[in-house]
Amino acid sequence: MTQLAIGKPAPLGAHYDGQGVNFTLFSAHAERVELCIFDANGQEHRYDLPGHSGDIWHGYLPDARPGLRYGYRVHGPWQPAEGHRFNPAKLLIDPCARQIDGEFKDNPLLHAGHNEPDYRDNAAIAPKCVVVVDHYDWEDDAPPRTPWGSTIIYEAHVKGLTYLHPEIPVEIRGTYKALGHPVMINYLKQLGITALELLPVAQFASEPRLQRMGLSNYWGYNPVAMFALHPAYACSPETALDEFRDAIKALHKAGIEVILDIVLNHSAELDLDGPLFSLRGIDNRSYYWIREDGDYHNWTGCGNTLNLSHPAVVDYASACLRYWVETCHVDGFRFDLAAVMGRTPEFRQDAPLFTAIQNCPVLSQVKLIAEPWDIAPGGYQVGNFPPLFAEWNDHFRDAARRFWLHYDLPLGAFAGRFAASSDVFKRNGRLPSAAINLVTAHDGFTLRDCVCFNHKHNEANGEENRDGTNNNYSNNHGKEGLGGTLDLVERRRDSIHALLTTLLLSQGTPMLLAGDEHGHSQHGNNNAYCQDNQLTWLDWSQASSGLTAFTAALIHLRKRIPALVENRWWEEGDGNVRWLNRYAQPLSTDEWQNGPKQLQILLSDRFLIAINATLEVTEIVLPAGEWHAIPPFAGEDNPVITAVWQGPAHGLCVFQR
């Protein structure tokens, strides 16, 4: 049998050099590491990794080739109270594997044991890693590098975006390849999108609980191999990487950036009763935050929390991010539950991973977006991330919904959110683009459901409607559910128009949820993470609707307004913004706090947003000048208005002079 040479301790993972494969694995507490190679018949061959440099185990297998399937068995103590759960009976995934062969099924053999180890061997059913070789012709690909001030983000799910698209070939619908199809790219361009933000594409697993209910993890926030693409989104698992890069190359040629939603806060191994796939069996004590009793700190709500203050885990996370940028040319990341990235365990702006990103010449140059919270004490960190990061602005989301969907909100609070929440983000040299403004996202009601449902309807998730937030700030306008009288439909449409206008004409970086622009509904499900069906797949039959045209017109209008694209904080008297009451006069202190929800926002001295969010038709006196309503608010008969606009209830209009 061929013996392993010592090899090199870097880089991490399995790397083919044309003559063989170098294998490396981090484990600070292991006593022995076996590399397990599987031939075409499934026969296993084991080799001890002979090299041990610091905490890195390594070895080199001559004559090994791409396509080789492998895994690890890691020997060490079984001491749960101290956080050690080594079990060499279980085959483990390389955390840096680039491709996985096999499925992560709910099976007792994929568990290591709770208090006592389960020594039943699982190699016959455990997924295997695959050695890959990286040769790809990027041609003249270059990142679009869209300025933050001009960025329009479109959040989408790889499968759900195209699975029902009638103009995309059936054989590629719901795949990476479909993202780069001309039909999809033309749609995004016509809409005005500059950045496609994808829900997780790294290999993930469905939780055992969901599998037992006949459901699956649809969103993908349950990672198991952070360097490997999820194979279900590929036409062929063997070509997944090239399919993904082909799509990115095509999107780049159209000037569209690609941002990946990435999950660095927890793994699919869940709590102590969860499966054993990789990190828990490699070095549980190093990879996770461990309590004094040996259990996990569950700061994510998913059972475990990655210890991103440990130097080796920081190196792992940094290498993962660099891989996606350097190998796949992605343009940025949205970090799920990103407060975990700054835990030491308390949250710090100079936490090790933040510092590593700041100092990296690759990662410091891409777009970085934080979901700025986790569920631990002190986990709400909106506005507190390092200057390189933009952040999801939930203040904006809640204020926009409260203002337009009939909840009490003072004009001052609304204006503050409209002005990029400067009270939150104007610090440490940050710009207005640091505020990622959103009204909806994958997590929560869709925009249409915000105006059709007062309550969540998550029964299909199998948790008796207990899951999902109850703080929706929604308004069904008098009837729970879709459909209704013509008057009801029109009132809901007006609310959708108002929310979209607020989102797309506010200062900050707007993020649009895919499908909101043509009225996609999840029938009141505000936590559709396990619904891989028509509830979440976009119905493109409405894509040519008036709402789609309305949204596109708003985006193109935004790009014409200097105050919104110059990415500078608005200051008193700088000509960027004036806040006026219904009589075209500056608002008084009392009006800001107690006045009716009527407001005029003059941007760049030429564009006027007139707002009447009250229940009554109201005359709005426009500032001096000749004003025209502009698309998408202009009708066929578009006379010059010099004095008064009849503002309908819950209405708004945009004018230009």
Swiss-Prot record:
This is Glycogen debranching enzyme. InterPro entries: GlgX_C, GlgX_Isoamylase_N_E_set, Glyco_hydro_13_cat_dom, Glyco_hydro_13_N, Glyco_hydro_b, Glycogen_debranch_bac, Glycogen_debranch_GlgX, Glycoside_hydrolase_SF. It comes from Escherichia coli O17:K52:H18 (strain UMN026 / ExPEC). CDD domains: AmyAc_Glg_debranch, E_set_GDE_Isoamylase_N. Gene3D superfamilies: Glycosidases (3.20.20.80), Golgi alpha-mannosidase II (2.60.40.1180), Immunoglobulins (2.60.40.10). It catalyses: Hydrolysis of (1->6)-alpha-D-glucosidic linkages to branches with degrees of polymerization of three or four glucose residues in limit dextrin. It is an enzyme of class 3 (hydrolase). The record marks D443 as: Transition state stabilizer. Removes maltotriose and maltotetraose chains that are attached by 1,6-alpha-linkage to the limit dextrin main chain, generating a debranched limit dextrin. Signal peptide: none annotated. Its EC number is 3.2.1.196. The active site is at D336 (nucleophile), E371 (proton donor).
